[in-house]
Amino acid sequence: MRFQVALLLLSVAVARALPPVYKRDADSGDSQNPPNQPSKQSSTPLPPESSNQVKTTRPTDGQGQKSDKKDQDKTTLAAVSSKAESGPPTAATDHSLGDSRRQPEKTDAELKETARPLSPVNPKLEKSDQSSTEDSGKPTGGNSGKPTGGDSGKPTGGDSDKPTEAGSNKATEDDSGKSTKVDLDKPTSKIFPDTETSKTDKVQPTEKGQKATLTSKTESGETLAGDSDFSLKPEKGDKSSEPTEDVETKEIEEGDTEPEEGSPLEEENEKVSGPSSSENQEGTLTDSMKNEKDDLYKDSSGNTSAESSHFFAYLVTAAVLVAVLYIAYHNKRKIIAFALEGKRSKVTRRPKASDYQRLNLKL
């Protein structure tokens, strides 16, 4: 609040100090431009996209809000100062024109900075903004520059906001209406086939039930001959089912009685199994003892067999030696003659022809 009050005081001081400058600008502007042009410029200081972007930046950027508040405060103070002073209307209009010209420049600079991160605006909102700006431009054109700076600044802020909100609301209502209409149309179209399918489903089980009864009856061996037969056959089927149920109950009763009779038998079996189990244990002990004895016998027999095998080996070798010695003893003369004959043959060798030739050469 203090900051706003200080801005108000500064704007009032500037407005009082600069009226002659605006008069000169007004004289030059009136000579160059007709009276309708400034009203159009003041009426449309912002393009439609800029108004939308300013709206989008207001909830997010605190700096944009402060700048907009400053501009609005300046315009309102200029309007109040122009009304308070009894000067000509041209000065007020020129002052409003100057403020309105400054506003687009500031807003354009701000929009260029904010337009980069922002996403594109919806086309429906752009159309509604254009229509609102055109509506705001019409009354200023008719008044030919008479409205003050406050009037020229208002359509940019409040009037442009209201139609856009109304247009957006209308668009949302139209969209919601269309969606509801489409949704209402769709379920109605879907409900009918569902009901038909449910009807067909209801009919099918009855048909299946009839077919099942027919097949069961045909399996029982009965012939189908008409409606009267259908009414009679269930009775026959009931009669045939009753004896089967009686037979099943009898079997169940017999099955129940059998375990009762079998219970004492089980006790006897347990009694018999008791001594038999003890006998089996004794039998296993005796078998183990027999197995141990057999192992001992096998060991002893193995040892004896090994000893006997060695004994037989010794006997065989001794017999062979005795036989050799016996033969050698009886044939000792022949053996000695054979051994000595070899020596004799070497000494008593007959001379050869080579030996005679050598003797002849020597002589």
Curated annotation (Swiss-Prot):
The keyword Methyltransferase does not apply. Glycans are attached at N303. GO terms for cellular component: Golgi apparatus; plasma membrane; trans-Golgi network; trans-Golgi network transport vesicle. Residues 139-156 have a biased composition (Gly residues). Widely expressed. Residues 29-59, 274-288 have a biased composition (Polar residues). Residues 133-188 are annotated as: 7 X 8 AA tandem repeats. Its main location: membrane. This is Trans-Golgi network integral membrane protein 2. It comes from Mus musculus (Mouse).
